[in-house]
């Protein structure tokens, strides 16, 4: 089977949990060919991969959102305007609903911008666009400067309309690794070639964007609700079109259903790691120090600032502690030097760094995000025991107290480490995860036939 993986802002451009997962996934699935359809922010990153692509990656198609800013109106502007002025009632309705971030008919928009090659700039400079925007502003933003609404709407719509005109790589199935822009491209692929669409979410993309927008200073406060609705609208598109939607843990699946995904489509497939590679790492010998590790990429969502503040507080109470912030290293070599690990993210899915730490018999202190609490304490029916401490995000004092408690007793660390290792061995092995995805692809074959490329 030729599978088009639709990726946004991760593999193969940057290291990180999702990128590591993706690289291992492709490498093991040797029986399939993979096409990478990747969305990046900046065209200057074209071809700058930090991974050596496996042999079964047969094509890479790169799309960069800043290329949308280079769009110009077609030379045949009169023809474009003629088509805009003759939008059907169905097309006008879908464009209005797109601008209102409600429930547009995406097939109508795919036909308009992909099949008929409507130029996004022609529409965004048209009288039709201004009329729809004016009506919306009078209804929703009567006291907001029209210029603010105009530029907000253009910046919101331009990337989407640009992506709808993308050249679509041919594949047997389109497997998106997030909702958002990536999910929309997967829907476009399914539309163009009438092929099935799959979705795997490592986190809940919509909720992550919502958190970012709430904190963002670049978004005009009056339009934050509109931006949040925009990303919910994109999620709805792939939730409706996807044949199956997978998540990493039960609460994430329940969130998908709450947002609007059909429960019948949803399935939990937990992350998996190379357990055997990590389980043989010996515990660090006692040397008078307690060494704490953070295996993390430097990104705002990882909240390294709180980690450093919390460690400063800890070091004022205990003199024999050291913090190692690691990224892009051979985890096997560094894990030998650590007594336990920490994770301070403000948002996560099912962090591989925690599972890797458990496999090596190192307990963890984490923030209460994603399924971290489930990893530490176990899900229903799991009696392996506690494997660490969980504290609220951005809670500096709580994090310092949890680290101090972990530092106080080597015996406790060993006991918790054994619990984490047993849990990982039972539920989070890479072989088990791959088996579930192979089963998923077989379901696609059975549902859609085997008329593959």
Q: What residue spans do the PLM features occupy?
A:
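A conserved nucleotide-sugar
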Residues: 34, 304, 308-329, 333
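Membrane-proximal helix-turn-helix segments that form the acceptor-binding/catalytic region
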Residues: 160-170, 192, 204-205, 222-245
């Amino acid at each position: 089977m030729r599978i088009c993986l639709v990726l946004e802002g991760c593999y193969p451009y940057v290291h990180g949990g999702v990128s590591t997962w993706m690289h291992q996934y492709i490498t093991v699935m040797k029986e399939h060919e993979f096409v990478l359809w990747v969305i990046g922010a900046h065209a200057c990153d074209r071809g700058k991969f930090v991974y050596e692509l496996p042999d079964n990656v047969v094509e890479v198609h790169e799309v960069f959102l800043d290329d949308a800013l280079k769009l110009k109106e077609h030379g045949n502007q009169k023809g474009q305007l003629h088509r805009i002025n003759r939008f059907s009632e169905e097309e006008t309705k879908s464009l209005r609903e797109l601008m209102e971030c409600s429930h547009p008919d995406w097939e109508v928009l795919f036909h308009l911008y992909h099949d008929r090659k409507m130029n996004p700039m022609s529409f965004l400079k048209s009288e039709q666009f201004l009329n729809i925007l004016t009506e919306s502003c009078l209804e929703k933003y009567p006291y907001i400067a029209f210029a603010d609404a105009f530029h907000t709407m253009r910046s919101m719509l331009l990337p989407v309309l640009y992506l709808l005109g993308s050249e679509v790589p041919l594949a047997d199935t389109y497997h998106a690794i997030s909702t958002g822009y990536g999910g929309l491209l997967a829907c476009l692929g399914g539309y163009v070639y009438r092929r099935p669409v799959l979705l795997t979410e490592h986190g809940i993309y919509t909720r992550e964007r919502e958190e970012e927008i709430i904190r963002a200073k670049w978004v005009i406060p009056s339009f934050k609700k509109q931006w949040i609705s925009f990303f919910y609208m994109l999620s709805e598109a792939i939730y409706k079109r996807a044949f199956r939607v997978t998540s990493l843990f039960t609460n994430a699946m329940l969130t998908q259903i709450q947002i609007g995904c059909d429960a019948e489509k949803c399935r939990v497939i937990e992350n998996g790691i190379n357990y055997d590679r990590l389980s043989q790492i010996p515990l660090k010998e006692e040397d008078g120090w307690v060494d704490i590790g953070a295996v993390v990429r430097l990104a705002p969502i990882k909240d390294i600032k709180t980690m450093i503040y919390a460690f400063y507080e800890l070091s004022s109470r205990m003199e024999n502690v050291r913090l190692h912030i690691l990224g892009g290293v051979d985890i096997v070599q560094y894990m030998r030097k650590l007594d336990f690990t920490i994770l301070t993210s403000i948002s996560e899915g099912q962090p591989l760094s925690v599972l890797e730490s458990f496999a090596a018999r190192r307990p963890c202190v984490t923030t209460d995000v994603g399924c971290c609490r489930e990893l530490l304490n176990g899900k229903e029916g799991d009696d392996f025991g506690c494997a660490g401490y969980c504290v609220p995000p951005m809670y500096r004092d709580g994090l310092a107290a949890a680290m101090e408690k972990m530092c106080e007793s080597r015996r406790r660390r060993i006991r918790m480490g054994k619990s984490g290792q047993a849990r990982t061995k039972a539920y989070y092995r890479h072989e088990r995860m791959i088996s579930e995805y192979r089963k998923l692809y077989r379901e696609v074959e059975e549902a859609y036939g085997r008329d593959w490329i």
